């Protein structure tokens, strides 16, 4: 695959592999050996861009916690110099509720945990997972700038950012990429494109297949166990 460039200089494959579903949100965690093989196959196919997050956890049948970052870090360790690993901070899942904390203290604690679980000395792209209404974007951006100076991250991004939030953060520390929902079923963030072009910020789409709706796996005759499915 021919590389794309996010921001000023972050080269990635045009299609990235989102790893969330391996441990989180779609039932029990998948078999880790099978997922390791899948990740190795993805590298062999030309994928260089892999996405995870500190909050992508699940519960194994034995009751232990499956950490997505641990799975990704272990599987990609032999290819570390060939791949770009993106992870995220600032969100915790508390049952059906999200707790958002993007204070400098929380970000610093999170980055140390992610570095350890990923078995790496730096994170290529570190996202603020969600906007924290209690922390100004300038504060988050300044924290990210410090982490860059310390060599713990090399680029940073924001997930679910608005134009105003992006501009304020970018003025303090240039943002490499925005990761927002985008698909043929959800196109609200297309309004951001002119701003991204102006600021030279990349756009990374999540849920491009609308959580599977556009994957051709479902028909008008498909039936589910309950309405929540």
Identify what each model region corresponds to.
Residues 55-56, 78-102:
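Structural motif corresponding to the early beta-alpha repeats
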Residues 17, 35, 50, 72, ...:
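Conserved, mostly hydrophobic/aromatic
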Residues 106-127, 150:
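CE4/NodB-like, metal-dependent polysaccharide N-deacetylase domain
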Residues 3, 39, 69-73, 111-115, ...:
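Generic structural signal for well-ordered alpha-helices
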Residues 10-15, 46-48, 79-83, 120-124, ...:
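Short, well-ordered coil/turn segments that N-cap beta-strands
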Residues 131-229:
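Beta/alpha (TIM)-barrel catalytic core signal, keyed to glycine-rich beta->alpha loops juxtaposed to Asp/Glu
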Residues 1-83:
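N-terminal binding-site loop/beta-alpha segment at the start of enzyme catalytic domains
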Residues 21-33, 93-108:
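Active-site mouth loops of central-metabolism enzymes
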């Amino acid at each position: 695959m021919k590389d794309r460039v996010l921001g000023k200089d972050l080269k990635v494959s045009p299609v990235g592999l989102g790893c969330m579903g391996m441990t989180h949100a779609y039932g029990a965690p998948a078999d880790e050996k099978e997922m390791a093989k899948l990740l190795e196959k993805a590298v062999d196919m030309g994928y260089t861009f892999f996405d995870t997050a500190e909050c992508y956890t699940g519960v194994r049948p034995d009751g232990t916690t499956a950490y997505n970052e641990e799975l990704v870090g272990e599987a990609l360790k032999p290819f570390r110099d060939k791949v770009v690993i993106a992870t995220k901070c600032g969100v915790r899942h508390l049952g059906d509720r999200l707790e958002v904390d993007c204070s400098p203290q929380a970000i610093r604690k999170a980055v140390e945990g992610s570095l350890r679980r990923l078995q790496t000395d730096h994170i290529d792209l570190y996202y603020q997972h969600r906007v924290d209404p209690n922390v100004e974007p300038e504060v988050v951006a300044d924290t990210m700038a410090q982490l860059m100076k310390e060599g713990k991250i090399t680029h940073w991004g924001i997930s679910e950012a608005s134009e105003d939030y992006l501009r304020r953060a970018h003025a303090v520390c240039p943002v490499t990429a925005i990761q927002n929902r985008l698909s043929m079923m959800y196109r609200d963030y297309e309004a951001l494109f002119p701003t991204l072009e102006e600021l030279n910020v990349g756009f990374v789409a999540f849920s491009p297949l609308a959580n599977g709706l556009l994957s051709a796996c479902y028909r008008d005759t498909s039936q589910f166990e309950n309405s929540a499915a």
